Amino acid sequence: MRKRTGKKWNTGLALLLCLAGLSGCQNASGLPETSETEQEERIQIGITFDSFIIERWQRDRDVFVSAAQELGAEVNVQNANGDMEEQIAQMDYFIQKEMDVIVVVMVASDEDESGLIEAVGRAQKAGIPVVAYDRLILNADVDLYISFDNVQVGRLMAEHMQEHLGEGGELLQVCGPMADYNVPQVMEGFEEVLGNSNLKIMETEYAEEWLAETGFTATGAYLKTHYEVDGVMCGNDSIAGHAVRALSECRMAGKVCVVGQDADLDACQRIVEGTQCMTVYKPVEKLARRAAANVSIVSLV
């Protein structure tokens, strides 16, 4: 364990990386100058992920670790496997190891978040800044928040549906869990665009803990009562894949406009096949690299 040198942490800093421009970030060349002693002491970053079931998080992990190492930092990666208590334990482990900064991809579940909020407070009390990566920890005074413009993601989904279903139609929404702060933001952008269209949201379902199979069960249940649907808005491409599976069982795949986000490889293949209309590509590589650079800055402030 390393002895702390009385650094003052810059609390209350908030940063939003948008799809358009990823502005407001300082690059690696803008890192504060450090003494030879500090340069010899590599920055220790602890990062805890919700899980790696969703393909996108694997990409974030790999790029973040690579970028941080290029900047001279060491990264300890932990996987909470969708368990809030496990994520809290991982944060306490990072505190015990006296990490320079802790990065959290919050577990998106209906579990009480008070324990996670308290863990953020314990880290900051120990002089360790906490960064919320792509999922804001509500009611926690994190030092840095890094994400995309999720409202714009919703707008892009709706705009494509509007173009594809110009004469109007009935839609099913299968969103992620409301426990994920990004979900209501995406819905806000989606519904904002639909307010000026002939498209109508008939039903909204939520995939708790981002359970992708909800796409199959929700779409199948909807078709049993409504018999047809013109479009399915899915919270991500994993959910979209299962929605397409349900449509296939009803011989409707390719006839219904299905949209998602993350640009997973399977989604791109479905687009080529014609069973998924579009996916919102979010430059996670750019986000992860900018995050690594800014996390390094926060650790030196």
Predicted features along the sequence, with ranges:
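A residue-level marker of the well-folded mature domains of exported/periplasmic proteins
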Residues: K3-G6, C25-V301
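Sec-dependent N-terminal signal peptides of Gram-positive bacterial secreted proteins and lipoproteins
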Residues: K8-A28
